[in-house]
Amino acid sequence: MKKIEAIIKPFKLDEVKEALQEAGLQGITVTEAKGFGRQKGHTELYRGAEYVVDFLPKVKIEVVLGDDAVEGAIEAIRKAAQTGRIGDGKIFVSNIEEVVRIRTGETGMDAV
């Protein structure tokens, strides 16, 4: 099993969610996040004063899936989240040792 974590622009969330559903994925976890990469933040004007906003709003999507579904999920996220501009985000893939459904005690892919 693998866990995909994708950091994307907030306005792309609905497109990514739909793309993952079309790819056959059932459940995702979404968390609001703030961060920056190469784009470093931006300057804003407030009451006549300029200030630098270091952290930009992002959304983190997490999904656990079988190894055979990883490439399709990555491609679905990449295509749906891409704007072609700096700050589109990142996709991280990591191994998952075990999953347990709390309600039933099911484990492994049965718990996903």
UniProtKB/Swiss-Prot annotation:
Record flagged with keyword Metal-binding: no
SMART domains per UniProt: P-II
Source organism superkingdom: Bacteria
Subunit structure: Homotrimer.
SUPFAM superfamilies in alphabetical order: GlnB-like (SSF54913)
Protein name: Nitrogen regulatory protein P-II
Family: Belongs to the P(II) protein family.
Role of this protein: In nitrogen-limiting conditions, when the ratio of Gln to 2-ketoglutarate decreases, P-II is uridylylated to P-II-UMP. P-II-UMP allows the deadenylation of glutamine synthetase (GS), thus activating the enzyme. Conversely, in nitrogen excess P-II is deuridylated and promotes the adenylation of GS. P-II indirectly controls the transcription of the GS gene (glnA). P-II prevents NR-II-catalyzed conversion of NR-I to NR-I-phosphate, the transcriptional activator of glnA. When P-II is uridylylated to P-II-UMP, these events are reversed.
The encoding gene: glnB
GO cellular component: cytosol
Stretches that traverse the bilayer: none
The entry's keywords: Nitrogen fixation, Nucleotide-binding, Phosphoprotein, Transcription, Transcription regulation
Organism, as annotated: Mesorhizobium japonicum (strain LMG 29417 / CECT 9101 / MAFF 303099)
Gene Ontology molecular function: any one: enzyme regulator activity
GO terms (BP aspect): nitrogen fixation; regulation of nitrogen utilization
O-UMP-tyrosine carried by residues: 51
